Amino acid sequence: MTERLISLLREKNMKIATAESCTGGLLASKLTSVPGASRVFEYGFVTYSEGAKQKLIGVNEETLRRHSVYSSAVAEEMAVGCMEAAGADVGIGITGVAGTEPEIVMVDGVPTTVDPGTVYIACCCKRDGCTTVKVQRFMKSACARIGDGFREIIRENASDFAIEIAIEEIERCTNDTKS
């Protein structure tokens, strides 16, 4: 699947950038493990803190306050921000809770619980200014029998899902629906 994304980017003469939080650079690592990725991979941002998201890729403070760092709105701003900062054609933003405990965040001033395994992934394509936001939630109970590896399962699944979303978005943006 990763090879397919790199091949598609090369075929379409497009560049990609990533902005990752809960995956901690795993997506960028997967992309750059494919021979020839240097022709299409521009930047990989690991923006774990809110400050890094604001400073490096332009996530709006108001968006963080109104929606929290764990939201589709922030994932979308991460995708657009990394794409613009890198001068790329495609941007992917990933944010979420990969840990085993719920996170309490403020959403418009109201304390809100975000469950473990809640991951927001956004992909945008510069060709037509379109942005697709997909929400994927990986359930802790489904992974419980595996043991202590829940965090790694979330990170792996989120980065793989981001690759799938990118392929779909590039095909949609370039009006190429061939599989």
What residue spans do the PLM features occupy?
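Short alpha-helical segments enriched in small residues
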Residues: 1-179
